[in-house]
């Protein structure tokens, strides 16, 4: 039951005369880390900045929060306008608020991360018109959830210069998805609806940055009931096609 809040005359008078310029008002931005997995690595969608500051550097898709929208709505708007995506798995990641993270003014960034099948991001990054977008491979030099530097590499393996503190945001996103692998179906959005346990294991290995024992992985996934068999087998995969599975629960938030 919701209790209706009443506004007193004193509060109305206070609000009517309130000076919104009394305290500094930092800008708020929303940046989205769009991640996928392919070829044994984590990849992220980046865009080249056309304007100052950091012109020519690569940045996460983002934008400033509008005065009349929620943070989740802003993240959804960024996905639609910068990447043409709707209804993908998206979760709030972290708030980055170092005073000098943006040379223009005080800008607080609320970061989100989104998980997308590789084909989707490849299609966006290789669109026939020049979108200024690039699918970058993430070079993660640390193990587990310790955190540390993350470099973004182009297709030739060259390190891409990143704008603002976006390398730190990428690092936090990798740390988050590594930490969630044990209790959430992170791979759901990174795989087709039906997949083999090998497909799922390769996704986990790419995220963790290390190999996994095949039998132990299979046993752990099946024992926890994270996936259920579809009753079908993969087509065109030799004499003994693998059994296909689907996730039993989609614990994701769409924006």
Task: Please give the residue ranges for each predicted region.
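N-terminal leader/linker segments that precede catalytic domains of diphosphate-processing enzymes
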Residues: 1-255
């Amino acid at each position: 039951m919701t209790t209706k809040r009443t506004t007193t005359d004193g509060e109305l008078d206070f609000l009517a005369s309130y000076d919104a310029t009394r305290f500094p008002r930092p800008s708020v931005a929303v940046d989205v880390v769009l991640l996928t997995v392919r070829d044994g690595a984590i990849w992220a969608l980046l865009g080249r900045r056309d304007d100052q500051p950091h012109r020519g550097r690569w940045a996460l898709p983002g934008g400033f929060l509008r005065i009349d929208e929620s943070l989740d709505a802003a993240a959804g708007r960024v996905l639609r306008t910068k990447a043409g995506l709707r209804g993908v798995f998206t979760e709030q990641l972290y708030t980055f608020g170092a005073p000098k993270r943006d040379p223009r003014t005080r800008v607080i960034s609320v970061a989100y991360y989104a998980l997308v099948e590789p084909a989707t991001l490849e299609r966006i990054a290789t669109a026939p018109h020049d979108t200024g977008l690039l699918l970058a491979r993430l070079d993660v030099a640390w193990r587990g959830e310790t955190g540390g530097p993350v470099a973004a590499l182009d297709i030739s393996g060259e390190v891409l210069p990143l704008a603002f503190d976006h390398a730190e945001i990428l690092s936090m996103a990798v740390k988050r998805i590594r930490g969630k692998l044990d209790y959430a179906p992170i791979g759901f959005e990174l795989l087709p609806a039906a997949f083999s346990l090998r497909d799922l294991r390769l996704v986990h290995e790419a995220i963790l940055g290390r190999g996994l024992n095949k039998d132990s992985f299979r046993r752990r996934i099946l024992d926890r009931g994270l996936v259920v068999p579809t009753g079908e087998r993969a087509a065109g995969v030799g004499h003994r096609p693998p059994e296909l599975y689907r996730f039993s629960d989609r614990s994701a938030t769409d924006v």
